[in-house]
């Protein structure tokens, strides 16, 4: 979904990861090729299944989700990637084993964003910006989050510990919270949506934010537009992407 959003926004995209040599893996490769998203760093592995998510809806609202998956064990990419060839690297950690081993080694001038799931210190120490939701921030910081101040304290702890530039905390109906060095804190007000379907909202935030921050270097502007884009997406059923026309309407 991140790759589809980036491509829809006009970015040239290359995917890296591991999927199964199966029906759904072949389907994924076909979809990505159709969208002109490079798959040269996607490994199709025998005896591994491609993750499949089945969502159960009732009255246009998601009630549950069934995941068919297998966790990779100590996977590393077969082909070395020169990350400096890319303007931006986004790491989407779904905790399926892709990042269980330390193989990602960016150079000091790379722009890297992590959408985290669990605490992986080797990843946190390799990135500039992370985009956790409240539950993920609580896990990463090992702190209970029950107020704005507790959220800020947890984020500031991670900023110092891993030398991060910024943390964008996605808070659903409460909007975004941008936290940076030197006690920088900025609240991004929510855009209320009636009966939202939050599927893919985090993917939209990281995609739109990354695209804009890469071109403007304006953290607040980029986060504000990303927040508006997420509101548009959650107003629809299931996953959807934003495109350049959508982006213009948010500016």
Could you describe each region identified by the protein language model?
Residues 66, 140-141, 179, 233, ...:
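Residues that scaffold the ATP/ADP-binding catalytic core of kinase and kinase-like folds
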Residues 66, 187-188:
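Hydrophobic residues at beta-strand termini and immediately following loops
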Residues 86-98:
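Short acidic, glycine-rich surface-loop motifs adjacent to enzyme active sites
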